[in-house]
Amino acid sequence: MPPTQAESVIKNIIREIGQECAAHGEIASETVVAFMVKAVVLDPSNGFNMDRTLIKTDVQKLVKLCVARLLDNKNPSLDTIKMQVYFDMNYTSREDFLEEHHRVLESRLGIVSREITDNRASAREELENLYRKIVSYVLLRSGLGSPTDIKIVREATAALQSVFPQAELATFLTLSKKDKERQLKELTMIVTGIRLFNRDCGKGGEGIDDLPAILHEAIPTTTQHIDSQLQIAQDQAFRYTAILEKVTNNPLMAKELQPYMLKEALYNVRQYEIFLQTVLSDIITCAEEVEMMIKQLAAQLEQLKMAVKSKTAVPTSQVFPIFVALASLWMSFQDETVLISVLSNLTTNLELFLGTHELLFPEKVMLGLLDGVVVKSDLTRIEEHMEERVELADFRTQEWLFPETTANFNKLLIQYRGFCGYTFAVTDGLLLPGNPAIGILKYKEKYYTFSTRDAAYTFAENPDHYIHLIKEKAKKNAELIQLLELHQQFETLIPYSQMRDVDKHYIKPITKCDNGTQTDTHILPPTTMRTYEWNEWELRRKAIKLANLRQKITHSVQTDLSHMRRDNTSQVYPLKEASTQSKREGSSRVPRPQIFIAGLRGGQSKTTYGVKVNLTRAVDET
């Protein structure tokens, strides 16, 4: 069957089921009906084949079963499914809610903004009308009073005129549409800051609620109410768990109590508890944000008072940023107020899905079932087995995580919302809290906790078997898919709010161990930049030199001695050490000079004549 045709068939089935329920006086939303259709098809006891196209008899059977389950107002399972659908359709995370809230405000202001930015006023009356529209826009965007209240309008107009006189409208009209929108937002922030400052000084603030005081009173009240509801839900869950524990050990009693739907009631109250914890976590975050913002508000107002004091004129560059920061802070107070209101209403509406407990289990019935039963809290059950610990030596192929060896131990995403998977599988649906101190089993990149060490050992022997049992149990009770977070195993029933997290990877454990490493003193060779200059004046001189070179001309001159010069290269063999040895040593002796002078004694003549006689032997004389 083509996808479009299949969708058409499903829509017709949902419409027919809704009409049947309406005929019996029960109004069921399309979302609840669609969820119930998938739940009935998943239940193997109904005999539907997921791989085969539905024929007419199958459709009639499906409609009949869905209508019967939707009209069974005494079934806690139906209340749990309705609760899950309601919470999924009405709850969003804090970030998503604030983002959507701001988007809605922008869309509502779009019409007023376009009336201002598209205006082509020229006459005096038209300009005055445009200025009034700007005042209304400022009031609507800031949320500080109604634009129909004369006192509030006068106060806002006076604040606006102090920063944006009507004479500047002509300049404003010459701006582009984008610049106009930006200036309108800036004017809103500044005017809001001025009005808040005047309110703090006792000179204005008409129509401005004391949001810090309102939040300071509303948050503790809401928190106390949720805490009390959470305590009641937990006490009820502990009582149901104690009775079911007793029933597990007594088969005869199990048959007697089967019509009471104890397990379905336990799932209902556990789901309610989980939703309350989610809402309470958001409210605690709100309380922390509000506490921080109250301190910031006091600091901003004090800074503004110090800047203004008794001065007649203050530079805009000094006070405008503070006005903007003050307005931004106040808008955050408004966001927190809306968020607290939504969460409070959500909590109140969740209580509507708990009506079956009073019908099925009045106090007299509960006291009879609790006879001889010890009611234990989740904390008590965990403390009873705190000393138990899985021995790693017993498991060579399984990986176990412990608090002292895992850095992000408390951030791991535990399967089945932290309930013991083994107990749930072998007792046909009993929910007992897992004790992480015993050890967390890591199997196929998923993490499992157990109520006792014996449960951990047995589950670890064949995890796939127990995982399959849990999946089959969830097919019979569709509310378990969201309660135990089995969305990856049933992708057709993933809540809309969790669709974006389907492909999100699980947090991987960061294991800790004692280890030592040694590195070289200098891993990389030293790099010294010879051309590096830290002095900016030296860099400036180099820049000027390079700039001057662009204006220079190169001249060449040749002389008689240089015109024949050219670049020359030569290649030589590298130096090497060499030595020689002669066969014999020889020497030679030169003749000794023998020079004589004759006639020194004189003679007969008066004049003496000396004669030099060289008798030195020749060199080559043998």
Curated annotation (Swiss-Prot):
Location relative to the cell: Cytoplasm, Cytoskeleton, Cilium axoneme; Cytoplasm, Cytoskeleton, Cilium basal body
Region (Disordered): 568-593
GO biological process assignments: axoneme assembly; cilium movement; regulation of cilium beat frequency; regulation of flagellated sperm motility; sperm axoneme assembly
Signal peptide: none
Keywords assigned: Cell projection, Cilium, Cilium biogenesis/degradation, Cytoplasm, Cytoskeleton
One Gene Ontology cellular component: ciliary basal body
Consequence of gene loss (knockout): Mice postnatally develop hydrocephalus, show impaired mucociliary clearance of the airways and are characterized by male infertility.
A Pfam family that the UniProt record links to this protein: FAP206
InterPro entries reported for this sequence: FAP206
Matches recorded under PANTHER family: CILIA- AND FLAGELLA-ASSOCIATED PROTEIN 206 (PTHR21442:SF0)
Protein family according to the UniProt entry: Belongs to the CFAP206 family.
Protein name: Cilia- and flagella-associated protein 206
Source lineage: Eukaryota, Metazoa, Chordata, Craniata, Vertebrata
